[in-house]
A protein has these predicted regions:
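Acidic, low-complexity Ser/Thr/Gly/Pro-rich repeat segments typical of extracellular/periplasmic
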Residues: 25-28, 37-41, 45-124
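Short, solvent-exposed loop/edge segments of extracellular or virion-exposed proteins
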Residues: 31-33
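Bacterial N-terminal signal peptides that target proteins for export
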Residues: 1-9
Length: 124
């Protein structure tokens, strides 16, 4: 069997393995604003709920909107398996992406993900 055939089979197997591992566990249960929601008013905070208490020291949240990254402050937990942070600058109409990173419970793994929400024009 030639080298190209073996190499092709190897690449195919690696691709199958990567597909099988793409359905990875995520500790995120829900969020405020809701994942994929269209809001009637601009949020002043972000709050993400996990299946176990997140480690704040190993966590970060980012909010990216139509005008770039928003300033956030005061990442903390309310002891409800959550992370909460204040949005400093005004959230205007448009599409937003929340990027999160955290470690939860006794699990040594660090997890990450993104979700979107939108703020429509007034009157919509």
């Amino acid at each position: 069997i030639n080298f190209e055939y073996r190499f092709g089979v190897l690449l195919f197997c690696l691709q199958l393995i990567s597909c099988a591992t793409n359905s990875v566990y995520s500790p995120l249960l829900r969020a405020e604003p809701e994942i994929g929601s269209e809001l009637t008013r601009a949020p002043r905070t972000l709050r993400l709920y996990f299946d176990e208490l997140p480690d704040v020291s190993q966590s970060s949240l980012r909010l990216v909107g139509p005008n770039g990254e928003h300033q956030l402050r005061g990442l903390h937990t309310m002891s409800e398996n959550d992370l909460m942070i204040e949005i400093i600058d005004p959230v205007t109409r448009g599409e937003y992406r929340v990027e999160w990173v955290t470690a939860v419970g006794a699990d040594p793994g660090v997890y990450s993900g993104t979700f979107n929400f939108s703020v429509p024009a007034e009157g919509n």
